Amino acid sequence: VIRVLEIGDYAAPDAGRMLVGLGAEVTIVEPPEGVAARRTDPVGFAHRAAGKSSALPEDALALAPQCDVILDGTWGGPLARVAADLAEAAGDGAVHVVLAPYGDAGPAAGWAATDLTVAAAGGMLALIGRPDRPPLRPYGDQADQLAGLNAAIATLVAARAGGGQRVVVSGQASVAASLEFGAITYIHTGRVPERTGSTHPMAPHTLFTTADGLIAGGLGGSPRMWDATLAWLVDNGTAGDLADERWQDPAYRVRHRQEVFDLLAGIVGEMKRDQLFHEGQARRLPWAAVLRPEELAGNAQLVDRGFFVDVMTPEGPARDAGFAARVGGAAPPARLRVPEPCEHTVPAAAEPRARNAAATPRRRGALEGIRVLDLTWVLAGPYATKTLADHGAEVIKIESRHRPDPTRFSPGFHLSRSDETDPDTSGYFNNVNRNKKSITVNLRTQEGRDLALRLAAHCDVVVENFAAGVLDRLELGYDRLRRVREDIIVVSMSGMGHTGPWRDYVSYADAVSALSGWTALTGEPGEQPVGVVYGLADIIAGHHAALAALAALAVRDRTGAGQHVDMSQLETAAAHLGDAILRADRGETVEPLGNRHPRMAPHGVFPCLGDGNWVAIAARTDEEYARLAAVAGLPYDPRWTTLTGRKANESALEDHIAAWTRSRPAEAVAEILQGNGVPAYPVRDGRTLVEHDAALRAWEFYVPLAHPAAGTFLHEGLPARLTRTPGSVRTPAPRLGEHTAELLTDLLDLDETEQAALRANGVLE
């Protein structure tokens, strides 16, 4: 069991919650009266603190030598000195994880931060919202949670290396590494993606109004899905000219998707939401009801899979969102209780920290020696295996021209200045598949399935994101795999999970966002929600799959046992809804907030000089507002001197701030406000992230690598820096089947004659 001391309020509470979900013993370090969040945000505190204990700083100092990890979110705050003392007391064998909003180097290293400003700094805001409105923050402090998630991953990576190192996690880099197409579109095409409201710019999906609600859906992303959509329209007599030959071209469909949307709207508007959801799924289309938080508690799939947890709060028992993944041998406490302040005292004879015999000298990555079989495609799964590869694992990606990864071949995802039929030049594929090897194996053949099974026997971990049941039909299910390697770990990450009434339902990221409550809560107050259209839900699922694999490896190190981790992307998204489920359980009506915040004002995104330039500004306290008002020359108004007054008159206040920012460059606004201790940051887009952001440049975030087919281009780097096992972006993404002969020779001992026979039989295609 990993023992963690958690201190500070920047993203550490989120990281601590994720580690609690994987069986860690987490103790919050706080003053006698408790951390401020207990008083200012008791529901949010309960959500993040359940399952943890609490200790005074002096007791924590005595506990430190027995702890494995110091989880430090004090960056620039009043407890920073205490955190440093804890790290010193823990000694050289512990892992000190430092969460830094903008990294620990460069001009922004000491800047003030909130979730809003870090989301702006990392490029998240630029991708969300309607094109004629300001960039929009998603619900649930997603930038903070991404930093916490990367800290949790880095914690298990460092622990696997035997502890004894310092880790720095950049919140900005955590966001910048999670943008799907946000920056790589600029890197590979020179274009900057625009905000497209509720419509994904690469996949033809959007939101539709039904007779009684909203639903996410569209044309689908494959020929099969297009045929199913067309058949649906034909069955309803509203197909128009969609049977014409030109509509068979997927690029044409993407360009003219609004025509199809208009025809679909004719069906959707007359039907009830849930009827549409289930009929679309019956046609194997990734349509999804837009659910509100209060509906989630009765969600048949989440209930059947036991997702929700009971939490004992100071006000009594409550139902909350569960954890993103369940790993055997790494379970959270059976009783999730919100701790009383400083209840943890030092045992009379505290057990010393176990010294990990696997501790190693400095090396490239903590996962060197671990081999992963990658049976994933598109984004969520490849992101998981990319994370493992970045930290040194040998990742073998099985591909086939008979089931091509759409991000290699689809024009919508290709992102390249070159021939869009070339599978080796796709910027999308090449970004999330670096550091991997590629072998082409046709799993539609018995010989191909046998080869995959033989490869799995040489692997520690298998990661797959097929729909439920597909792996079993390929004769590669967990029960079959563990017969060839008893201690193998299989991480499945289907949309809905392998059990439950929706196990066979198909999903895209927008469907997961809709079903998890994200979509309903991301928008402007009083308006139809916009949702999160880019693949953030996919990337969060990928992070959690990597985290689950690391936890399962730690269990295997301890017990010798492998296991099957049955993840659900619906659950990973719902786990990131923040405290909304807990609030709904308490009877609160949870609504979209837009860019506003219940405990800060101003808290928004304001226009700046130049077309499409914006700055995020937040005042956390009355003192910060006073400094903002002085710098901006805002007129004195007694209503604005308190948070209550500012919230009651927020629109007028925002108008005054916008009048000041509109004539000034975003960089200048951010610099003068940060010089006065007020959180602010320009809203970065793909171009400004890559070309102009000094904090990411100081982090050395974008890494150039030469690709034999695509040339030299930048890759998104690592959000975490580890002193002893840093991980790296080492090799470009493989060409299709680049390592086939090498792997068949080195792992399976097949000679050239045997390989030639397999090729002749279509097995290696």
Report residues per predicted region.
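Short, well-structured beta-strand/strand-turn elements
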Residues: 25-26, 281-295, 395-398, 674-689, ...
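Extended, hydrophobic interaction surfaces within ordered domains
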Residues: 20, 139-140, 147-161, 168-169, ...
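N-terminal helix-loop segment corresponding to the beta1-alpha1 unit
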Residues: 1-161, 274, 311, 344-561, ...
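Terminal low-complexity tails and localization/encapsulation signals of metabolic enzymes
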Residues: 1-3, 194, 209, 292-374, ...
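Conserved Rossmann-fold dehydrogenase catalytic segment
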Residues: 133-142, 163-175, 194-200, 245-248, ...
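Substrate-binding/catalytic subdomain of NAD(P)-dependent oxidoreductase enzymes
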Residues: 158-196, 276, 292-293, 552-594
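A short glycine-threonine-serine/GTX helix/turn-capping micro-motif
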Residues: 135-146, 199, 203-205, 214-217, ...
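Aromatic-enriched alpha-helical interface/lid elements that frame and gate functional surfaces
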Residues: 204-283, 287, 602-676, 680
